[in-house]
Amino acid sequence: MDAESIEWKLTANLRNGPTFFQPLADSIEPLQFKLIGSDTVATAFPVFDTKYIPDSLINYLFKLFNLEIESGKTYPQLHSLTKQGFLNYWFHSFAVVVLQTDEKFIQDNQDWNSVLLGTFYIKPNYAPRCSHNCNAGFLVNGAHRGQKVGYRLAQVYLNWAPLLGYKYSIFNLVFVTNQASWKIWDKLNFQRIGLVPHAGILNGFSEPVDAIIYGKDLTKIEPEFLSME
């Protein structure tokens, strides 16, 4: 990532986004904030293409996501992904990485276990005619759990998803056993628009686990949820 370049921030680089709605901004600037109840400064970076971020960071994200799959408690995948499979899944359209830094660009060769706080992707939930309804997947670095990183990731999502042209958010599978996740969406006034009974066969549970379907209108987000102060 070139500190002097603006190309990596341009929404014109968005791939596989909403078909009928254009981004609301020409660029997405890195977003800086402090972790809740802490003086730790974090910065969220938009990722329109993996060519703009270090290979070492991609490799760390790849490893981190496969560990989450292997835990068998939050994502529906059964087997670890290949490197290309991960790239196709996480970076299909747009992703975000949040680092513990006050820099406005991503430096190479960092200790990602210490620096990476979390990541998420945003992509259409449906085929082109309904592609303005987005889905997202979130991942907090286990080394930083307990710092309310997940809530900050959710706030960045609410700030940036509308800028990409999305009008509505749908989360298809929030397992009822994933309390850390559903507490965030309830707190941010996402609506519980459905329940999938016996949705997942998860590790550590003897019976299939239900999943909540969440929805939220991205054109009417409460201002207090967007504030990162």
From Swiss-Prot:
Any GO molecular function: azetidine-2-carboxylic acid acetyltransferase activity
Keywords: Acyltransferase, Cytoplasm, Mitochondrion, Transferase
Modifications made to the protein after synthesis: Not glycosylated.
GO cellular component: cytosol; mitochondrion; nucleus
Binding site residues for substrate: N135, N172, L173
SUPFAM superfamilies documented for this protein: Acyl-CoA N-acyltransferases (Nat)
Enzyme class: transferase
Catalysed reactions listed for this entry: L-glutamate 5-semialdehyde + acetyl-CoA = N-acetyl-L-glutamate 5-semialdehyde + CoA + H(+)
Domain N-acetyltransferase, residue spans: 65-219
Binding site for CoA: R145, G146, Q147, K148, V149, G150
GO biological process, one term: L-arginine biosynthetic process
Protein's recorded name: N-acetyltransferase MPR1
Organism: Saccharomyces cerevisiae (Baker's yeast)
